[in-house]
Amino acid sequence: MNISEIENFIIEKLKPNFSNLLVQGFPEKPQEFTLLHPVGAILVHYRGGNYSTTDALGFISQDKKMDFALTIVTRNLRSNNGAYEVLDKIKQVLCGFKIVGCSKLTPVKEGFLSEISGIWQYEITFTLTAPSVEDLEEGGINAG
């Protein structure tokens, strides 16, 4: 399971639960993103990962802990469809969500990002673990 596939599974899980918001991957040029949606947006992106240690002398197999961040962009803080409500609902929808080949999504951090001209931005980060396995090719070079 690669990063893009996991990101897409998260987006597809959110869409039916947030039909009143724009749900998509984080923009390629975030500095150019303008909230045009009348209510708000949820923007999903891969934040990074860490690999477990290995003492393997032969075949390498590790766990990769991956963090995915969801940026919530809303026009309200507390009222209907405000940042607080969206944060709570995202946690409810994604906590325990299992993507095939990965561990369940677990929330690890959330917080305030910014407020500019009444547009509120918060972020919630989820983590999961996926296997990272050496790609064995026949006839590979043996440096041994």
Q: Model-predicted segments: where are they?
A:
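Residue-level signal for secondary-structure boundary sites
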Residues: S52, N76-R78, S132-L136
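Extracellular/virion structural assembly segments
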Residues: F59-K65, V73-C95
